[in-house]
Amino acid sequence: MTVSNTVDQYTIMSGDRSKIKDLLCNRLTECGWRDEVRLLCRNILLEKSNSSNGVTVEQLIAEVTPKARTLVPDAVKKELLMKIRTILAENEAEN
């Protein structure tokens, strides 16, 4: 089992995963990331709508995901990493 899987499993079992997810959603909204991704999707849909086939949800996701990941601010990534480390440290201290 990888470290990532172990952390994921622990956060699910401890109930902290939803807290982390809520924090991520809030931070991405606050920094404007969600608006940027929404605009990116809209632009891709407009661009692809001119083609005869249009675009499927799977194609949109495949095209947007790598770009959206690069748009996540470093400060948000660092904050989430620190939160996860804190949760793991608290767990280790309890055991």
Swiss-Prot record:
Alphabetical keyword list = Activator, Chromatin regulator, Cytoplasm, mRNA transport, Nucleus, Protein transport, Transcription, Transcription regulation, Translocation, Transport
What are its GO cellular component terms?
cytoplasm; DUBm complex; nuclear pore; nucleoplasm; SAGA complex; transcription export complex 2
Q: Which Pfam families does this UniProt record tie to the protein? A: EnY2
* InterPro entries linked to this entry: TF_ENY2, TF_EnY2_sf
Gene Ontology molecular function terms on file: chromatin insulator sequence binding; transcription coactivator activity
Tell me the GO BP annotations in alphabetical order. chromatin organization; mRNA export from nucleus; positive regulation of transcription by RNA polymerase II; protein transport; transcription elongation by RNA polymerase II
Quick check: keyword Transcription in the entry? Answer: yes
Where in or outside the cell is it found? Nucleus, Nucleoplasm; Cytoplasm
What the protein does?
Involved in mRNA export coupled transcription activation by association with both the AMEX and the SAGA complexes. The SAGA complex is a multiprotein complex that activates transcription by remodeling chromatin and mediating histone acetylation and deubiquitination. Within the SAGA complex, participates in a subcomplex that specifically deubiquitinates histone H2B. The SAGA complex is recruited to specific gene promoters by activators, where it is required for transcription. Required for nuclear receptor-mediated transactivation.
Q: How does it assemble?
A: Component of the nuclear pore complex (NPC)-associated AMEX complex (anchoring and mRNA export complex), composed of at least e(y)2 and xmas-2. Component of the SAGA transcription coactivator-HAT complexes, at least composed of Ada2b, e(y)2, Pcaf/Gcn5, Taf10 and Nipped-A/Trrap. Within the SAGA complex, e(y)2, Sgf11, and not/nonstop form an additional subcomplex of SAGA called the DUB module (deubiquitination module). Component of the THO complex, composed of at least e(y)2, HPR1, THO2, THOC5, THOC6 and THOC7. Interacts with e(y)1. Interacts with su(Hw) (via zinc fingers).
Q: Of which family is this protein a member? A: Belongs to the ENY2 family.
* Name recorded for this polypeptide: Enhancer of yellow 2 transcription factor
Gene encoding this chain?
e(y)2
